[in-house]
A protein has these predicted regions:
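Glycine-rich, proline-tolerant flexible connector loops at the mouths of alpha/beta enzymes
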Residues: 35-69
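Hydrophobic faces of well-ordered beta-strands that scaffold small-molecule active sites
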Residues: 5-7, 35-37, 91-93, 112-114, ...
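Active-site mouth loops of central-metabolism enzymes
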Residues: 6-19, 67-69, 90-92
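Conserved small/polar residues in nucleotide/adenosyl-binding loops
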Residues: 175-181
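Catalytic domains of carbohydrate-active enzymes, especially glycoside hydrolases
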Residues: 22-38
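Conserved anion-binding
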Residues: 120-172
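Active-site beta->alpha loop and helix N-cap motifs at the rims of alpha/beta catalytic domains
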Residues: 59-116
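Conserved, mostly hydrophobic/aromatic
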Residues: 8, 27, 104, 163
Length: 185
């Protein structure tokens, strides 16, 4: 694979399609090849206790209201899909659970992405690998053993993949960079 530049949008759109489109436009203007989002089924990723806990936000007073305010559903992803096609930029998303991966399968994204926090979720890895779609696998929050297990799953299903060694805290200080790890993965 040649150099491929992807702009991480994640949930930085704040649940607002106009902000989302501005971020896609900025990625296009910057010469990016793709934009990436994050998709979660809140009831699969978080506990009821956590979702019910207090959190003041523009969307309400609980974690659930805040998290739900940041999530896009089918109509928004259909709009993202069309907007990216119209602007000749790829898009894909990291699914944080099985339901979200199944949701994303209805779109014709070139790539899958595994978030480093999900590298220990074997059912999710298997579901993604079975698609045999080129997959970017983040390793920033993982042990070498976790990485080896994931690689084994993707090789078993003959799914092409790329290991990425990001740092999972933003911004990262120079002293916390783990660049030598790139040689290991």
């Amino acid at each position: 694979m040649s150099i491929y530049i992807c702009a991480e949008i994640g949930i930085n759109h704040n649940g607002d399609m106009s902000i989302c489109k501005q971020l896609i436009d900025a990625a296009c203007e910057s010469g990016c090849d793709a934009v990436k989002f994050q998709k979660r089924d809140l009831d699969q990723v978080y506990t009821q206790e956590f979702l019910d806990s207090p959190r003041e936000s523009p969307w309400g007073t609980t974690q659930r209201e805040q998290k739900a305010g940041l999530e896009f559903g089918l109509s928004e992803y259909q709009e993202i899909d069309q907007y990216c096609k119209d602007n000749n930029i790829d898009w894909y998303a990291s699914a944080w659970d099985l339901n979200s991966q199944k949701f994303l399968q209805q779109f014709d994204c070139k790539y899958n992405k595994v978030a480093s926090a999900m590298l220990v979720h074997n059912k999710l890895l298997k579901t993604i690998a079975e698609e045999k779609k080129y997959t970017f696998i983040s390793t920033g929050m993982s042990t070498l053993k976790d990485i080896e297990k994931a690689v084994k799953i993707f090789r078993k299903f003959k799914c092409p993949f790329e290991l990425m060694n990001p740092h999972s805290a933003y911004p990262v200080s120079y002293t916390h960079l783990t660049l030598p790890t790139i040689l290991l993965v």
